[in-house]
Regions:
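Intrinsically disordered, charged and Pro/Gly-enriched terminal/linker segments
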Residues: 21-30, 35-42, 54-64, 82-172
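Residue-level signal for inorganic ion chemistry
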Residues: 49, 73, 132
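Low-complexity basic/metal-binding stretches
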Residues: 1-7
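Short, Lys/Arg-enriched N-terminal segment that forms or immediately precedes the first helix
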Residues: 8-21
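Conserved catalytic core of two-component sensor histidine kinases
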Residues: 67
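C-terminal flanking helix
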Residues: 70, 74-81
């Protein structure tokens, strides 16, 4: 399976094997992955990532540092196609990288869109609730220091999760 897995619980699995990271060698690629996920993962402007990851001014404006870090992240994910850079925009390929936070957000958005509890199939609702609880392991990237770019996704996921839990509770 060519899918990669980035979990809220701070683990990274590549082709089913959990990776362990020691030292600083993988810090920037992992920071890039976290930032990409937090910013939606699709067409994230390179300058935004550069400002987040290298707040201190760099000679070339950070472009070379970003290129090197993208290359290192691709190696880490075992796929040159997992991260694309087109027209100074960076994308994490969702067909190659499965992100539990994105799956959870889609699930929560769908449940919010149906009023939180689709009536036709209670067993389907129970399965959706079980999956939602499985995916939501707590605050998004809870072990990370408070960063301005993490706050929106943390609040969005937590808020939607709380609203859905309250709505689901009303049905049981």
């Amino acid at each position: 399976d060519e899918r990669h897995d980035r979990r809220i619980s701070e683990t990274l699995e590549v082709r089913g094997a959990q990776l362990r990271f020691e030292g600083k060698s993988q810090r920037k690629p992992l920071d890039l992955l976290k930032a990409l996920i937090a910013l939606g993962g699709r067409d994230v402007p390179a300058h935004v990532l550069i400002e987040l990851l290298w707040p201190e001014p760099l000679e070339d404006g950070g472009q070379k540092a970003l290129e090197i870090t993208v290359h290192r992240l691709r190696r880490l994910l075992l796929s040159d196609d997992a991260v694309r850079v087109t027209d100074r925009r960076v994308t994490l390929d969702a067909t190659l990288a499965w992100v539990d936070a994105w799956t959870l957000e889609r699930m929560l958005a769908a449940l919010v869109g149906t009023g939180g509890a689709p009536e036709p199939a209670i067993e389907g609702l129970e399965a959706a609730a079980a999956r939602m609880f499985e995916l939501y392991g707590g605050e998004f990237l809870a072990g990370e220091p408070e960063a301005p770019w993490l706050i929106p996704i943390r609040n969005r996921i937590a808020g939607r999760f709380q609203r859905i839990v309250l709505r689901l509770g009303a049905h049981w």
